[in-house]
């Protein structure tokens, strides 16, 4: 294979998919591919798909249809489809889009380079789906999108049986990574410049169930607190069933674990929670929130909510609104229920009419928008520490601002004084001057700027390549990647 073949990975879905795409990119580059420059047509396009939402199928097949004339004009181009939708649809993808070259599943992403080569040599589509994961794939190369913040997967799969969710069927039973492997990867990314790590799992706080340690997750959080140079630790997404007191204590007592918690509610109605097979009730959820706020008063709590689950009545929906008003989430990812073939909920009676779902959804949005704005308004006049990010603010250039995340993960847009150089990965302290439902603004200037190792790493990664002036041995070069859009919600949310 020519060393000049280029690739592009298109990612849909949750944070786990984003991290899987980093590993797919690492695999391709290890096999000699180069990332396609923006505006060019890649030799290989990889779709890393999601199967959680109803429009996932339409989105994939629509994009595949757009690529058909490109493939017709360039038969050597290859198209690969992986991820949860590939695990679900398998050979159906080739039937509906016969110009696709490779279909691979969630359990064998490491096979992608070999499958591409086999398809190229044999001139026929390759479909390879593995039914289950034998062990956690800890050794796959990774091309990280960020040098200052990193995803680190601690488990894959899920042992829950929520009636609306197809993820366990596609990702399999939970497989836990060994603690030593996790901590070794965290130390490695910190050595490369990262100062923030997010621990990932479909049900992240159930970590340890495979090897029989019910406190493994809290122990892991405390171990992260001992890693020199690691300034921020986050995790997503926990399940209320497994949110135990030892986890709350570890969050409160480990300084680099951030005061932020994303915990899916899904519904405030006990009747609907039972139909969803969620193994908690509203009172249990509220008690967890109470304990978290007792231990971590400044914690920002976010959630997921599904509107219009089969059988949901106006009384059930009112219970959801009541719980949301009581908790006062900093933010909520809200979804209109959609049928997923293969899930028990898809065949339930009493499917809620679409117009009713939309009307309730709008009321839910209006409530959460008000709460988010009221909670954010409490920050006006307060100073916050922000880890400067890349690609977080769509209008930063227009407003001459930069953006980043506060300790509690609130998005902050801040003005940069003329003549001051701030890099992604640096830390700034700013005073909030304005609050909106989804972000804070700090236009009064930077109170403190701390240049960090992460900022140094970002600067080194984005420095122009220098041409050698003598006769030197050829060394591999690392290009500057484009930032990937942040992805929220989705199948990581338990």
Curated annotation (Swiss-Prot):
GO molecular function, one term: metal ion binding
Positions with a binding annotation for [4Fe-4S] cluster 2: 158, 162, 165
GO cellular component: cytosol
UniProt KW keywords: 4Fe-4S, Cytoplasm, Iron, Iron-sulfur, Metal-binding, S-adenosyl-L-methionine, Transferase, tRNA processing
Biased composition (Basic and acidic residues): 458-468
The protein's enzyme class: transferase
Oligomer status and interactors: Monomer.
EC numbers on record: 2.8.4.3
Listed HAMAP family: tRNA_metthiotr_MiaB (MF_01864)
Function: Catalyzes the methylthiolation of N6-(dimethylallyl)adenosine (i(6)A), leading to the formation of 2-methylthio-N6-(dimethylallyl)adenosine (ms(2)i(6)A) at position 37 in tRNAs that read codons beginning with uridine.
PROSITE patterns membership: MTTASE_N, MTTASE_RADICAL, RADICAL_SAM, TRAM
Residues covered by the MTTase N-terminal domain: 5-121
Annotated family: Belongs to the methylthiotransferase family. MiaB subfamily.
Localization per record: Cytoplasm
Note describing how the cofactor binds: Binds 2 [4Fe-4S] clusters. One cluster is coordinated with 3 cysteines and an exchangeable S-adenosyl-L-methionine.
Catalytic reaction equation(s): N(6)-dimethylallyladenosine(37) in tRNA + (sulfur carrier)-SH + AH2 + 2 S-adenosyl-L-methionine = 2-methylsulfanyl-N(6)-dimethylallyladenosine(37) in tRNA + (sulfur carrier)-H + 5'-deoxyadenosine + L-methionine + A + S-adenosyl-L-homocysteine + 2 H(+)
Named cofactor requirement(s): [4Fe-4S] cluster
Full protein name: tRNA-2-methylthio-N(6)-dimethylallyladenosine synthase
Pfam families for this protein: Radical_SAM, UPF0004
UniProt xrefs under CDD domains: Radical_SAM (cd01335)
Binding residues for [4Fe-4S] cluster 1: 14, 50, 84
Chain intervals for the UniProt region annotation (Disordered): 458-494
Domain TRAM: 377-446
Species of provenance: Thermobifida fusca (strain YX)
Domain Radical SAM core as annotated: residue spans: 144-374
Gene name per UniProt: miaB
Chief location of this protein within or outside the cell: cytoplasm
């Amino acid at each position: 294979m020519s060393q000049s073949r280029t690739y592009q990975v298109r990612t849909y879905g949750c944070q786990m998919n984003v991290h899987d795409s980093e590993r797919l990119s690492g695999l391709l580059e290890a096999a000699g591919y180069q990332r396609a420059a923006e505006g060019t047509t890649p030799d290989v396009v990889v779709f890393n798909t999601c199967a959680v939402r109803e429009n996932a199928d339409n989105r994939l097949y629509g994009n595949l249809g757009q690529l058909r004339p490109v493939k017709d004009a360039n038969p050597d181009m290859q198209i690969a489809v992986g991820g949860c939708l590939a695990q679900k649809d398998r050979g159906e993808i080739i039937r509906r889009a016969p110009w696709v070259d490779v279909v691979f599943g969630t359990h064998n992403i490491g096979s992608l380079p070999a499958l591409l080569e086999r398809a190229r040599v044999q001139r026929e589509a390759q479909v390879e789906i593995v039914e289950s994961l034998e062990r956690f794939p800890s050794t796959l190369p990774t091309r990280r999108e960020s040098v200052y913040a990193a995803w680190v997967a601690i488990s894959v799969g899920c042992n829950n049986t929520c009636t609306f969710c197809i993820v366990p069927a596609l990702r399999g039973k939970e497989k836990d990574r060994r603690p030593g492997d996790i901590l070794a990867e965290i130390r490695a990314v910190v050595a490369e410049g990262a100062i923030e790590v997010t621990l990932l799992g479909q049900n992240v706080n159930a970590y340890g169930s495979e090897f029989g340690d019910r406190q493994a997750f809290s122990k892991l959080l405390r171990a992260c607190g001992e890693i020199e140079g690691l300034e921020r630790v986050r995790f997503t997404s926990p399940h209320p069933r497994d949110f135990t007191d030892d986890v709350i204590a570890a969050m409160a007592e480990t300084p680099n674990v951030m005061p932020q918690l994303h915990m899916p509610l899904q519904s405030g109605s006990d009747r609907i929670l039972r139909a969803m097979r969620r193994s908690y009730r509203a009172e249990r959820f509220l008690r967890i929130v109470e304990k978290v706020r007792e231990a971590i008063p400044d914690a920002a709590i976010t959630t997921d909510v599904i509107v219009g689950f089969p059988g949901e009545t106006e009384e059930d929906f009112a219970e959801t609104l009541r719980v949301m008003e009581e908790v006062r989430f900093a933010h909520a990812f809200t979804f209109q229920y959609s049928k997923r073939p293969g899930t028990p909920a898809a065949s339930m009676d009493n499917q809620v009419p679409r117009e009713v779902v939309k009307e309730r959804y709008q009321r839910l949005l209006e409530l959460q928008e008000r709460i988010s704005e009221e909670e954010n308004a409490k920050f006006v006049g307060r100073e916050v520490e922000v880890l400067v990010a890349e690609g977080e603010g769509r209008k930063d250039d227009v407003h001459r601002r930069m953006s980043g995340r506060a300790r509690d993960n609130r998005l902050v847009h801040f003005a940069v004084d003329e003549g001051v150089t701030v890099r992604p990965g640096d830390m700034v302290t700013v005073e909030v001057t304005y609050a909106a439902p989804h972000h804070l603004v700090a236009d009064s200037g930077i109170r403190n700027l701390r240049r960090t190792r992460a900022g140094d790493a970002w600067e080194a990664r984005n420095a122009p390549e220098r041409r050698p002036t003598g006769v030197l041995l050829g060394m591999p070069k690392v290009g500057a990647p484009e930032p990937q859009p942040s992805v929220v919600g989705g199948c990581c949310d338990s």
